[in-house]
Every structure is written in structure tokens, then in C-alpha cells.
């Protein structure tokens, strides 16, 4: 039986630094998030984290790019040596090929509330120090994408994930079972204001056993 889990990205209001053109546009932004109930492997405590991020999204002739880099700073409950909290860098990259643009007609796959169809490839990458687990996640992914006809963007993707990790507690890199993820990403401008409402939400299926033979959630 599949065990489902959800991850909700913190939606945020950000200052828009965009310059839009018919065939070339980009948006780069910085942000900060804070939470008090983060969890880490083999740690029963709720962990507080400050998360600083740099994000970039851009479009070109055949599709779009998305890059997000998070720096996560934990409190002392996420620490291996009872000192300062652990530090983590988490990188997300997605490249979506737009079938309409590739076909030379942006409206070739437009119907109803759907603006177009595409195919997304990318990866997640992290490295962490200061805690007992010290994750080194590597996760390429790929799958189809539906792009909805809204101001800004609203994309729904079904992605296949190939996740592996090589934590300090395991002698070699371990690969989990390939598993799917349903992901929703959006960036909606707020009228004439220089602000956008942005975020993401993931729904991830079970990835099988962990590196020690136990179940995953």
C-alpha cells in the first residue's frame, strides 16, 4: 500500500523584478521564511528554521526555466554536537519544454482553461552539515506538465522521481524506489502592484525502504 505525504511550499508575496517581452522574460527575487515544526530523520524534536532563498524564473523560445536556492538555518535542536544549529543548502531546478512553442504555434495545444502542454525535466540537490544525518540528496526527475491559462503561470505536473542519498550514517549512496510526485506551481501578479503571489505544493508517493531497511513516509 502506498503511503502518501504532502509538502506545502510557503506561498509568499515578493517584490517583482520582472521585465517581460514577447520572446524573452525573467523574474529574479529573494525571500525569507520561518517555521517552528520542521522534522528531520531520526530526530523526534520539532525544529525551528530560518530559510533564506534566491529564486529565478525565465522564458525563452522553447519553454521556461525555474531555479530556487534555499539556505536553511536550524536551531539547536537540529545539532550533532549540541552547538549551533545545522546548515543546509537545497537547490531545485526545473526546465519545462512548451510543446506549442516547439511546434511554432503557442496556441497549438490550447483548450478550455488550458494554455498549453509541456514536458518538465530537472533535479533536486541538497547538502547539509552540523547534524547527525548530514543528507546529500540527489534527485533527477521528469514528466508531463499542464499549463493553465491564468495571469502569470499555474502549472500542474506529474513527475517521476529517482532519488538517492549518501548520509554520513551510510557507507555508500543509496537509491530509493522510483516514485511519482504530483506538483503544482504558481506565480500570479497582483493587479498593477509590483508584487506576485508565488508558491508550490507537492504530493509524493511512497519511495520504498530507507537505507537501513525501514519504511518511509
Each language-model region and where it sits:
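Short loop/turn motifs that connect adjacent beta-strands in outer-membrane beta-barrel proteins
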Residues: 21-27, 57-66, 99-118, 147-157, ...
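Transmembrane beta-strands of outer-membrane beta-barrel pores
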Residues: 34-38, 71-75, 121-129, 160-166, ...
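Cleavable N-terminal export/targeting peptides
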Residues: 1-25
